[in-house]
């Protein structure tokens, strides 16, 4: 797992925003929601912004997380989506 201190800084469960930056592709948002649904089923309405040149999408999604491990798993799996450049 990742070496983070989320467990020291946060009280769980809590809403946690993930920002996924990836290549502009029409299915990127659906892929992000699918990964989140796998680990935290719910009703999600992510916001999407397109870069000035249209090359990248930035998707922000708020997820109710239950532990440090839950956050780390989501970071790892979101980063593994094809075309994703960063997960913040």
Swiss-Prot record:
Protein family per UniProt: Belongs to the UPF0250 family.
Any Pfam family the entry gives: DUF493
Highest taxon, organism lineage: Bacteria
Gene3D superfamilies: 3.30.70.260
Phylogenetic placement of the source organism: Bacteria, Pseudomonadati, Pseudomonadota, Gammaproteobacteria, Alteromonadales
Species assigned in the record: Shewanella baltica (strain OS155 / ATCC BAA-1091)
Disulfide bridges in this chain: none
Protein name: UPF0250 protein Sbal_3280
Gene Ontology CC entries for this record: cytosol
């Amino acid at each position: 797992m990742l070496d983070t201190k989320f467990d020291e800084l946060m009280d769980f469960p809590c809403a946690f925003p993930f920002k996924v930056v990836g290549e502009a592709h029409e299915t990127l948002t659906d892929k992000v929601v699918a990964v989140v649904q796998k680990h935290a089923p719910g009703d999600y309405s992510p916001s999407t912004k397109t870069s000035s040149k249209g090359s990248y999408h930035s998707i922000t999604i708020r997820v109710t997380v239950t532990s440090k491990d839950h956050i780390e798993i989501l970071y790892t799996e979101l980063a593994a989506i094809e075309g994703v450049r960063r997960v913040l």
